[in-house]
């Protein structure tokens, strides 16, 4: 079935006043209603991001066409179709040299969402990359993907074990997917892809900590060349002291690895990334992880980054204490003794406790041939109303001297979510990330959820 636009006239006046989305909406058609719904709900938001970020008009058309013809067909059922996760995310990276728009998404063919053909999304991810790699204007090198996939993807035997009803039905969404993709939409040059592996299922079925799975995969890729190992070594040393455990949906740890990612470009330019979640929101804890217990104190840019992180901590009015998944609160209420809850038992401390499904996120970026890993911190924003979160982002931009971005940010946000009262909503601005490199200075990203809300 082909779905055609219905009565979408150009704005009053000259046709030249139509935005790229409005012009394309007159001629695009889609194979089913789900695809049409993705276009109508997410297309205008992407169009506004590109427009308000002052992308070249040709790039605006290119990226909207790319989204409509190549991303939407691999998103699966339309938005609001019973997802217990957010299958599409728009993010905007800000730095001194300007801003860049990026899309993050989970490739899910419709059949894989309603049948057991591809329960962990591995086939959908590979099919999506094969499709996107054929697009003119996309740079794609699958060597990094295949090297990591050979170590991190579930084997057929592991998949079968995870699909046992008593196991699979109790898993959270993070345990039921193996991969996500992201595409960067640069102002010049080619579109590039990045792939993510969520390793909770692999860890659970192999009874191996995610940290160990990740470190071993990176060492196997390095294959004795010492391109990745020097930067990996301080990470291994720091987390070896914590005695990391295999992932468990009912007994999460306070500090827990979750994800591995890499760019799907030539190996010499690929950034390999390790992501972890931290439940204790304290600045001293943040600083300890950011510096790997002091191992990075002499690395370029670390001191400057820490200074700005302290400013961000204050600007965001971080609610300090332990932040747990709501599942843990349920376990604690049902438990009659600490042992039956395992790691879900309350920590023996006087810190405040929140059961709000939020965590600080860190990633450590490893580039071939570089001595030091590059840390980045991700701050959840859902504890703030979107209006207050926007005020915090504006305050950060002003602190960084980005006056024009600060002036425009809140008005732009209202344009992305025209039907929302930002004083009453939360989580539309889902996460704010920050890193610092001496050559490029501060680098921050805002991640937007509930696209088209």
UniProtKB/Swiss-Prot annotation:
InterPro entries: Aro_prenylTrfase, Aro_prenylTrfase_DMATS, DMATS-type_fun
Record field: catalytic activity: verruculogen + dimethylallyl diphosphate = fumitremorgin A + diphosphate
Domain of life (superkingdom): Eukaryota
Keyword Zinc-finger: no
EC number(s) on file: 2.5.1.107
Broad enzyme group: transferase
Keywords: Alkaloid metabolism, Prenyltransferase, Transferase, Virulence
Any GO molecular function: prenyltransferase activity
GO biological process terms held by the UniProt record: alkaloid metabolic process
Site residues, Required for regioselectivity: 104
Pathway(s) of this molecule: Mycotoxin biosynthesis
Residues holding dimethylallyl diphosphate: 102, 194, 196, 273, 275, 378, 443, 447
Record Pfam families: Trp_DMAT
Positions bound to substrate: 89
The keyword Kinase appears for this protein: no
Function in brief: Verruculogen prenyltransferase; part of the gene cluster that mediates the biosynthesis of fumitremorgins, indole alkaloids that carry not only intriguing chemical structures, but also interesting biological and pharmacological activities. The biosynthesis of fumitremorgin-type alkaloids begins by condensation of the two amino acids L-tryptophan and L-proline to brevianamide F, catalyzed by the non-ribosomal peptide synthetase ftmPS/ftmA.
Family: Belongs to the tryptophan dimethylallyltransferase family.
Protein name: Verruculogen prenyltransferase
Species this chain originates from: Neosartorya fischeri (strain ATCC 1020 / DSM 3700 / CBS 544.65 / FGSC A1164 / JCM 1740 / NRRL 181 / WB 181)
Lineage start: Eukaryota, Fungi, Dikarya, Ascomycota, Pezizomycotina
Protein encoded by which gene: ftmPT3
